[in-house]
A protein has these predicted regions:
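Conserved short submotifs of the Hanks-type protein kinase catalytic core
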Residues: 89-103, 107
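Activation-segment/catalytic-loop signature of the eukaryotic protein kinase fold
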Residues: 85
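Protein kinase catalytic-loop region centered on the HRD/HxD motif
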Residues: 129-142
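C-terminal lobe helix-coil module of Hanks-type protein kinase domains
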Residues: 196-284
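AlphaC helix of the eukaryotic protein kinase fold
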Residues: 57-73
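Conserved activation segment of eukaryotic-like protein kinases, specifically the C-terminal portion
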Residues: 179-201
Length: 284
């Protein structure tokens, strides 16, 4: 099919051109959120730079703008950079750094045996580092709010990337360090997340950095045991400790995971850096 400018069909064919700049190469994925394409930037002829483009319904334009604003100041290896966003007819588009690899859910489904402890810990350490960066950002501390296997990509070099900031939320600097009455209204928000991975307080519309720690613990539990929390009773991790499902996991790692998924916020790790230190101390 010949390339056409300003193409806005539901699924764009290879060769279609968006915004007089981006040449669609192929579809990377589709879901309720929309479509993700691999594309080439026409303006950068010599480098033949490729990008990922998320196509979403027009009602998502506010989310596109919000994500772009939130991520514009982020600079971390695990966070894909934002390059552009725009709207055309019935759709909004978010252009970001292309990450080629597999998400953790796809990796897990492809495994006939349990993933190794060393592999899961390696991923978790990288995720902790990214969460620590987000939670302590100097301009707008951020809670990811939707950490789960399908939102974590591992590239061909083994580097972890957080790939969907659709539910991420930013807060004023210092917001989590001390109670500030003038920010009290910011604690309350919509109860959003993914059942099985989100902690109890998130269903009540309240989140803290420890909410992401719970989601990481839930993700690790799933990766180590193959027990999908979406198919189980909510908040039931204590009924199924890691080693009861996978005896090859060390007691030390089991303790870290179970601490992360404590129902009480205060029972979890105080912050992502503390959890990262515990993981690094396993000496695998």
């Amino acid at each position: 099919m010949p390339a056409t400018d300003e193409s806005t069909g539901e699924t764009l064919p290879p060769g279609a051109i968006l915004n007089k700049r981006y040449v669609i190469l192929k579809v990377l994925g589709e879901g309720s959120f929309g479509v993700v394409y691999q594309a080439r930037d026409k303006r950068l002829v010599r480098s033949r730079k490729q990008v990922a483009i998320k196509q979403m319904p027009m009602q998502s334009i506010v989310d596109c703008e919000r994500q772009s604003d939130l991520r514009a100041t982020l600079n971390h290896p695990a966070i894909p950079r934002i390059f552009d966003y725009f709207a055309l007819e019935d759709y909004s588009y978010l252009v970001e750094e292309l990450v080629l690899g597999q998400d953790l859910e796809a990796i897990l489904k492809a495994q006939s045996d349990f993933l190794s402890e060393e592999t899961v810990v390696g991923w978790a350490i990288q995720i902790c580092d990214a969460l620590d960066y987000l939670h302590n950002h100097p301009y707008h501390p951020m809670i990811f709010r939707d950490l789960k296997p399908s939102n974590v990509m591992v590239d061909d070099d083994g580097v972890v990337h957080l790939i969907d900031f659709g539910l991420a939320r930013a807060y004023p600097p210092g917001f989590f360090q001390e109670a500030q009455p003038e920010f009290e209204h910011l604690w309350k928000g919509l109860a959003m997340g993914t059942e099985g991975y989100s902690p109890p307080e998130q269903y009540q519309g309240y989140v803290r950095p420890q909410s992401d720690i719970y989601a990481l613990g839930a993700t690790m539990h799933h990766l180590l045991t193959k027990r999908d929390p979406r198919n189980e009773l909510p908040f039931s991790f204590k009924r199924c400790p890691v080693r009861s499902l996978n005896p090859d996991v060390s007691k030390g790692l089991e303790a870290i995971v179970m601490k992360a998924v404590d129902l009480d916020v205060e029972g979890r790790f105080a912050n992502a850096r503390e959890m990262q230190t515990a993981l690094e101390g396993l000496h695998l």
